[in-house]
């Protein structure tokens, strides 16, 4: 491709709303153009990178035995109602009516659509397993689209769906997809971690995320410093926390604690470690059908509530903070809420305790009475308490798998795999006949990769102050030939001959034959991030050209007659 005829409108200034380097460089480099909030056009350079990523994904998915399809972008709303996600997905699901007042949605994922497909054709265990995937456009009506391709409303995704006769075969496919995804992201040149994850609005049981490590990442992951354990903070577990100080010894009794409303004040008042205090976080929980009620989550005073864990524990769609006025209206004393008689006092359906509180002794808890707390609280004496993993893992907490410690890292989610089970097939009536001739729901898995997001993720991990640094498998071109002076016949002729020779060798090469200043051409090379540049300049008189490595901007002198062989070795 000749740069003089190539549509690559580069810009000197960064977009005003660009806070990430990927957003800035992809727009400045002419890879993408913003046309609306969270909506981007892919220009020729961006399309070339997208195609490179798409091809890697397709090759590995096909190798794993999956079959490519293309499902409708528009989905009948009735399918989403039947699966129970029409309300649960919230306002991010774009809903609309056609001219006949039929309800439709723009699919952010396609579980419902693919189940409907399988329902019509898969009738017997003999047709299983089956894995279908697509690389297609999606739409999610983000409330605050930001960070360029990282969090847009319109995006390209690889979404795959597998169907099985039993859980064992699903687990086999799940493990196969984990290995396949690892190969994909390794081929793309990414430093990534596989982490335990929450299933979110997709549902199902086991799930894992693939996180590209980058300080600009939106997700926080807990990583062990000694083993391979890693998990999204929303799903991270830890070794049970312990403290050096012994539990306070006190018989059960009520103490007057005037204006002692915070955990810090309570620990100071009784001269104990916050570990031995009982904290309650009260939230207003919202469920399907618009129903809402107060939910109570008890933890040790030194811990924080992980809201995603809490939301999942009670099956809520959303949790919101509760004001002191709302607590008082419910008959509670803010700052003094405890487990004793709480059910009778509030009629609450959701009173949960963190797993690490099971059989805890010597605790200090609110007495549900102003200016009073109980000491000597032993939770093992309570009956019918519900224990769930509620606490957020902190840096320095113990790894659940070894004696190591957990640290935080930032990551960009680029892939997510799920064990769905019968989460969709059962409500949508997708059944098959097993070997005994009995009807049962299809067992499912689903597997996603953010294809357009990967463009941004590569740059977030591979850039410098000058621009993009594409990896070998994602670069729009392998190499650019920079003609220092296009008015010099010898430079131009040599560049043309090298360009033709490289094309014959199957090298994707960009010939910068523009009548521009040398400095401008090099600035564009650095901005675009093509892996290598051959500079044809004054050194040609002495039979020399320069080879520049974009990753480190190191230059090397190469004999003009040897450059073709040198390039083929790269």
From Swiss-Prot:
A Gene Ontology cellular-component term: cytosol
Keyword Secreted (UniProt): no
EC numbers, comma separated: 6.1.1.15
InterPro entries associated with the record: aa-tRNA-synt_IIb, aa-tRNA-synth_II, aa-tRNA-synth_II/BPL/LPL, Anticodon-bd, Anticodon-bd_dom_sf, Pro-tRNA-ligase_IIa, Pro-tRNA-synth_IIa_bac-type, Pro-tRNA-Synthase_IIa_type1
Location in or out of the cell: Cytoplasm
GO BP terms in the entry: prolyl-tRNA aminoacylation
Reaction catalysed by this enzyme: tRNA(Pro) + L-proline + ATP = L-prolyl-tRNA(Pro) + AMP + diphosphate
GO molecular function, one term: proline-tRNA ligase activity
Source organism, top-level taxon: Bacteria
Ligase keyword on record: yes
Keyword terms, alphabetized: Aminoacyl-tRNA synthetase, ATP-binding, Cytoplasm, Ligase, Nucleotide-binding, Protein biosynthesis
Major localisation: cytoplasm
Pfam families: HGTP_anticodon, tRNA-synt_2b, tRNA_edit
Role: Catalyzes the attachment of proline to tRNA(Pro) in a two-step reaction: proline is first activated by ATP to form Pro-AMP and then transferred to the acceptor end of tRNA(Pro). As ProRS can inadvertently accommodate and process non-cognate amino acids such as alanine and cysteine, to avoid such errors it has two additional distinct editing activities against alanine. One activity is designated as 'pretransfer' editing and involves the tRNA(Pro)-independent hydrolysis of activated Ala-AMP.
Family to which this protein belongs: Belongs to the class-II aminoacyl-tRNA synthetase family. ProS type 1 subfamily.
Record remark: domains: Consists of three domains: the N-terminal catalytic domain, the editing domain and the C-terminal anticodon-binding domain.
Subunit structure: Homodimer.
Name of the protein in its database record: Proline--tRNA ligase
Organism: Wolinella succinogenes (strain ATCC 29543 / DSM 1740 / CCUG 13145 / JCM 31913 / LMG 7466 / NCTC 11488 / FDC 602W)
Taxonomic lineage from the root: Bacteria, Pseudomonadati, Campylobacterota, Epsilonproteobacteria, Campylobacterales
């Amino acid at each position: 491709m000749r740069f003089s005829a190539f549509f690559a409108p580069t810009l000197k200034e960064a977009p005003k709303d660009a806070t990430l380097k990927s957003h800035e460089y992809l727009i400045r480099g002419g890879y993408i153009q913003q046309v609306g909030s969270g909506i981007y056009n892919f220009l020729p350079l961006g399309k070339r990178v997208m195609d490179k990523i798409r091809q890697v994904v397709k090759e590995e998915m096909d190798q794993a035995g999956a079959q490519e399809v293309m499902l409708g972008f528009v989905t009948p709303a009735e399918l989403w109602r039947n699966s129970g996600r029409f309300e649960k997905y919230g306002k991010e699901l774009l809903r609309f009516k056609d001219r006949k007042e039929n309800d439709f949605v723009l699919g952010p994922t396609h579980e419902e659509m693919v189940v409907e497909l399988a329902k019509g054709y898969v009738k017997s265990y003999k047709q299983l397993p089956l894995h279908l995937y697509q690389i297609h456009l999606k739409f999610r009506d983000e409330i605050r689209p930001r960070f360029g391709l990282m969090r847009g409303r319109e995006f390209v995704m690889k979404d795959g769906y597998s169907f099985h006769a039993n859980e064992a075969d699903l687990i086999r496919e799940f493990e196969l997809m984990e290995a396949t995804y690892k190969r994909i992201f390794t081929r793309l040149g990414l430093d990534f971690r596989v982490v335990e994850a929450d299933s979110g609005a997709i549902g199902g049981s086991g799930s894992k995320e693939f996180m590209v490590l980058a300080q600009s990442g939106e997700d926080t992951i807990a990583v062990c410093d000694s083993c391979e354990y890693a998990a999204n903070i929303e799903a991270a577990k830890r070794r049970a926390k312990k403290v050096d100080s012994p539990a306070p010894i006190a018989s059960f009794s009520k103490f007057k604690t005037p204006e002692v409303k915070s955990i810090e004040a309570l620990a100071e008042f009784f001269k104990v470690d916050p570990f031995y205090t009982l904290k309650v976080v009260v939230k207003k929980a919202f469920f399907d059908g618009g129903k809402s009620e107060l939910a109570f989550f008890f933890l040790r005073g030194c811990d924080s509530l992980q809201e995603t864990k809490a939301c999942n524990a009670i099956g809520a769609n959303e949790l919101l903070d509760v004001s002191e006025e709302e607590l008082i209206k419910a008959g509670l004393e803010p700052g003094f809420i405890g487990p004793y008689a709480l059910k009778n006092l509030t009629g609450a359906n959701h009173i949960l305790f963190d797993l690490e509180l099971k059989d805890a002794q010597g605790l200090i808890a609110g007495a549900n009475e102003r200016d009073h707390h109980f000491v000597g609280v032993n939770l093992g004496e309570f009956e019918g308490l519900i224990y769930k993993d509620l606490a957020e893992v902190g840096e320095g907490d113990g790894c659940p798998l070894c004696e190591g410690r957990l640290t935080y890292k930032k990551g960009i989610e680029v892939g997510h795999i799920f064990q769905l089970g019968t989460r969709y097939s059962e409500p949508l009536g997708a059944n098959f006949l097993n070997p005994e001739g009995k009807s049962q729901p299809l067992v499912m898995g689903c597997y996603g990769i953010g294809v357009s997001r990967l463009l941004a993720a590569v740059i977030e991990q591979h850039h410098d102050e000058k621009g993009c640094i594409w990896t070998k498998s994602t670069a729009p071109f392998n190499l650019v030939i920079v003609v220092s002076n296009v008015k010099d016949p010898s430079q131009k002729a040599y560049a043309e001959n090298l360009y033709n020779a490289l094309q014959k060798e199957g090298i994707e090469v960009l010939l910068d034959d523009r009548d521009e200043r040398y400095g401008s051409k090099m600035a564009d090379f650095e901005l675009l991030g093509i892996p290598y540049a051959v500079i044809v300049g004054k050194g040609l008189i002495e039979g020399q050209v320069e080879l520049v490595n974009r990753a480190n901007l190191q230059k090397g002198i190469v004999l003009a007659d040897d450059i073709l062989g040198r390039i083929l070795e790269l």
